[in-house]
Swiss-Prot record:
One of its GO terms (cellular component) is ribonucleoprotein complex. Belongs to the lyssavirus nucleocapsid protein family. It is found in: Virion; Host cytoplasm. The modification Phosphoserine is found at S389. SUPFAM superfamilies: Rhabdovirus nucleoprotein-like. Displays a superantigen activity in human and mouse, activating mostly V-beta-8 subtypes of T-cell receptor. The gene is N. It comes from the Viruses. Phosphorylated by host CK2. Unphosphorylated protein N seems to have a better affinity for leader viral promoter encapsidation. Phosphorylation of protein N in ribonucleocapsid may stabilize the interaction with protein P, thereby playing an important role in viral transcription/replication. InterPro entries: Rhabdo_ncapsid, Rhabdovirus_ncapsid_C, Rhabdovirus_ncapsid_N, Rhabdovirus_nucleoprotein-like. Homomultimerizes to form the nucleocapsid. Binds to viral genomic RNA. In nucleocapsid, binds protein P and thereby positions the polymerase on the template. Protein P acts as a chaperone on free protein N to prevent it from aggregation before encapsidating genomic RNA. Transmembrane segments: none annotated. This is Nucleoprotein.
Amino acid sequence: MDADKIVFKVNNQVVSLKPEIIVDQYEYKYPAIKDLKKPSITLGKAPDLNKAYKSVLSGLNAAKLDPDDVCSYLAAAMQFFEGTCPEDWTSYGILIARKGDKITPDSLVEIKRTGVEGNWALTGGMELTRDPTVPEHASLVGLLLSLYRLSKISGQNTGNYKTNIADRIEQIFETAPFIKIVEHHTLMTTHKMCANWSTIPNFRFLAGTYDMFFSRIEHLYSAIRVGTVVTAYEDCSGLVSFTGFIKQINLTAREAILYFFHKNFEEEIRRMFEPGQETAVPHSYFIHFRSLGLSGKSPYSSNAVGHVFNLIHFVGCYMGQVRSLNATVIAACAPHEMSVLGGYLGEEFFGKGTFERRFFRDEKELQEYETAELTKTDAALADDGTVNSDDEDYFSGETRSPEAVYARIMMNGGRLKRSHIRRYVSVSSNHQARPNSFAEFLNKTYTSDS
């Protein structure tokens, strides 16, 4: 018997077939570099930096930026940001720099140049007559890279969120060591003319390169990261959420995964912990793999590990975390089942802790405590395990163990308890729910049951 087939009759004729549905056609690509070559892009001819500065600044003022010219300028301006490498820097077997080396952002990558001239038009009226200073170059680089951050802010953010961010960024780049080079609100006005620039591969690459550099190298102009920080772990919301989750519940990754009681987690956990990746290596190319073009479709995004993502944020909702209530539900990844498991895990880790004495007045007190604890352990091991109290949680031993939680779920038939539903409704009803958020899902799903 083929387990995938169904049998039925059509006009008295027996039909046997295998139902097939549309599947995810995209290949998840891991970012490991196997050819020992630095990530690279190709740009037009390197410009005269003074001419390029004047052209790009005039375009910023006129809200008419040429993306090719901007990228060419950003790559050329990397020479202004020299710093000292604090330690030997390697990633995926590539030696980026030795300890003590003088490096600039373009030491991290390979930027190839063609002979094609840029436009370098002056679209913003008056031309700057003198040559720009380094602080002026740094301010222009910072403002241009901030267009990346602004273009990554989703439309779901309410009110004047994006405008407020743009205003704060402008304030940074008009304060020493930077210098004011544009009028107030210029950044937001220009952003509206290039709102999708985060999708331009070369611009994204340069933003990631600057961010990777300034995240490691101490530098006078490190505040440039304000516009590029969103390239770190970009499209890794699944992995980032899991990392935050295990810190929140104070377990190791291995201990936390033992609570994932659902077959749909198997493929996602395998995908998320593929061997050979530098997920735990500081300052690795891995952190910026998306912007550096090392992977077309991230295996670590919320969509790639949707069941894990949903579970983590249902637990977060149970604990009243605003970030989880605002996160977007992955509708195709069993949100109803994940909300049930999330309720049980939320109850398990909410308002409870495992505590023990760790600090003592002197060594004598420490030894006395350890002796007393050993005596308790010996007594527990000698116990025959007979259940003699209604308060015991189904069996003797660690009630917070995966076995204990699984037993409670089974005893309740895989359904949420009333107390779980009340908690879900309580946290979600007091929150202004965004469309398709976890708060909205919980409100719509459980309000009538509370």
